[in-house]
Regions:
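A non-catalytic, helix-rich entry segment at domain boundaries
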Residues: 62-235
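Short loop/turn segments at secondary-structure transitions that flank enzyme active sites
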Residues: 33, 42, 62, 66, ...
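Mg2+/Mn2+-dependent nuclease catalytic core
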Residues: 88, 203, 209-330
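C-terminal, charged and often intrinsically disordered regions of DNA end-processing helicases
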Residues: 1-49
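Short, hydrophobic/amphipathic alpha-helical patches that form generic packing surfaces
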Residues: 33-38, 54-66, 166, 170, ...
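Hydrophobic (often cysteine-bearing) scaffold residues that line and stabilize catalytic clefts
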Residues: 48, 52, 160, 164, ...
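Alpha-helical architecture
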Residues: 27-28, 55, 255
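Short, charge- and proline-biased low-complexity linear segments
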Residues: 43-56, 308-314
């Protein structure tokens, strides 16, 4: 499971005192700077690039959440935004809650993308809808920050869109693999409406009572492959840090960017809106290795990650990270 919530009865540490991969890397890189930021609470200058990455990731995930069998390319950006949340900001498990995608009727099948090019065109238009809104929201947040530095005019929307499109191509490659694998091992279960305990966010409820509304017959279709290969990610509408994976002893937590699992393997992906040439790039490797450990311990030390990847959206490159051994994780 990509999410493991805290158990309040035994959590003596609390959400603000847990370690994270970024804190570990910050301390390893410069203990003094870590002390100033985490202990003395000094806040470093907040430059626009720190906010741009969040905007790119949000636009990308909102596109992933959507289905070309439900939404036309020009649909409103907030079509799937009104999801029910519990008091902690986690998507609600209330069986009586109303979910936006469950209220939509599928488009006629003859309007579904039938080629990779038409699917790509649809997804690109969805990104063009979501990215400007995400950038605007981040600009407002940056403007309100008392430690803001630099100029928002330094943000290049075209470069941000280029990074989103690079991510799209990487995800389409997963969809193409799913097509070639004839839907993978979960095709029949998906068509029957069976879902993991933490399903990939698609605007639907945790459980589908009957057959999946987009299920077809015979060979897997392109739209089915899009749906099946959709990775898990934090629902863009969930509360901030509401969907962490928390160590059973509550001293460490992490939030995965993408988890691909359609083929029966676990591939954790970290999205980076950069080219990977900075001083911190080495920390990204250790961050993913810590995530592999976190996955292992939150699955009773019985399930290991199969692959770790960093998607450098600025460089249009995928970096494969060696998965740590059990001995290393212990």
């Amino acid at each position: 499971m990509p999410v493991r919530l805290a158990v309040p009865e035994v959590d003596s540490i609390g959400p603000f005192n847990r370690l994270s991969a970024s804190q570990v890397n910050a301390y390893t890189t410069c203990p003094r700077l870590w002390y100033y930021e985490k202990v003395r609470r000094f806040k470093m200058p907040q430059i626009p690039v720190l906010f741009v990455g969040r905007a790119v990731e949000e636009a990308f995930c909102r596109m992933l959440q959507e289905s070309p069998a439900l939404l036309v390319a020009g649909a409103a950006a907030d079509t799937l935004s009104n999801i029910p949340l519990d008091d902690s900001g986690v998507p609600s498990r209330d069986s009586g809650a109303t979910w936006p995608a469950d209220r939509l009727l599928p488009l006629p099948v003859n309007q579904w993308p039938s080629t990779m090019d038409t699917l790509r065109d649809w997804a690109k238009q969805r990104l063009e809808t979501h990215l400007p809104l995400a950038l605007h929201a981040m600009e407002i947040e940056w403007e309100k920050d008392e430690r803001k530095a630099g100029q928002w005019s330094s943000v290049d929307p075209e470069r941000c869109m280029s990074m989103c499109l690079n991510g799209l191509e990487m995800n389409l490659a997963e969809g193409e693999r799913c097509l070639e694998a004839k839907g993978g091992p979960e095709l029949d279960a998906w068509r029957l409406g069976k879902r993991p305990y933490w399903p990939s966010p698609d605007g639907r409820a945790y459980e589908i009572p009957l057959r999946h509304p987009l299920a077809q017959e015979g060979a897997v279709t392109l739209v089915e492959a899009w749906e099946i290969a959709r990775p898990w990610f934090v629902d863009p509408n969930a509360g901030k840090f509401a969907m962490n994976a928390i160590h059973p002893e509550h001293w460490f937590q992490g939030e995965y960017d993408l988890v691909y699992r359609w083929d029966g393997r676990i591939n954790i992906v970290d999205l980076k809106a950069s080219v990977g040439a900075g001083d911190r790039s080495g920390n990204y490797v250790e961050q993913l290795r810590m995530y592999a450990m976190l996955w292992w311990v939150t699955h009773n030390r019985e399930e290991q990650v199969d692959a770790l990847q960093i998607w450098y959206l600025g460089a249009n490159a995928i970096k494969q990270i060696e998965v740590p051994t059990v001995a290393e994780m212990e």
